[in-house]
Amino acid sequence: MSNGKSLIILASFLFLHFSFITEEALAQEFSYAHATVITPKGVSIPVEVSDTPEKRSLGLGKRDKLEKGWGMLFVFERRIPPSFWRKHMRVPIDIIWLDNQRIVELAENVPPPQEGESPKVMEPRLPSNFVLELESGRARDLGLKVGQKLSFKF
């Protein structure tokens, strides 16, 4: 077999192999750094840090649950009104938008999309550079409110 044919066969194999990688498989490839978010009342919340476009795109999607007491902190390089949609979400969550660690908006008990439903897009009215996702009801349990400042330990 000529080198040209071997190269074409190899390239075809690699293309087919990599075209079947799913978002779920990609999620397993991500290694998330951990940090701690501290509430005004001093409660520490361990979080996974989602700080790349790929990690932010997947977020908590494809997970059947959040670990009890844990959350995910999305970090953006600049202040924007980051939109979030619930694609591939399986559990309800609270979404908290922060501008320089100050809460600018809360969306509590946001349900996952129903089967066949287009995921709802959620966007804050004000720019922010962090978004915290927690298990549904946790923001209320912690007494979190717009205007409060959270602390981060990276």
Predicted regions and their residues:
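Bacterial N-terminal signal peptides that target proteins for export
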Residues: 2-10
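Generic alpha-helix initiation/capping and coil-helix boundary signal
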Residues: 4-5, 18, 132
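Bacterial N-terminal signal peptides
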Residues: 9-20
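Sec/Tat signal peptide C-region and signal peptidase I cleavage site
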Residues: 21-27
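Compact, glycine-rich, soluble single-domain proteins
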Residues: 28-154
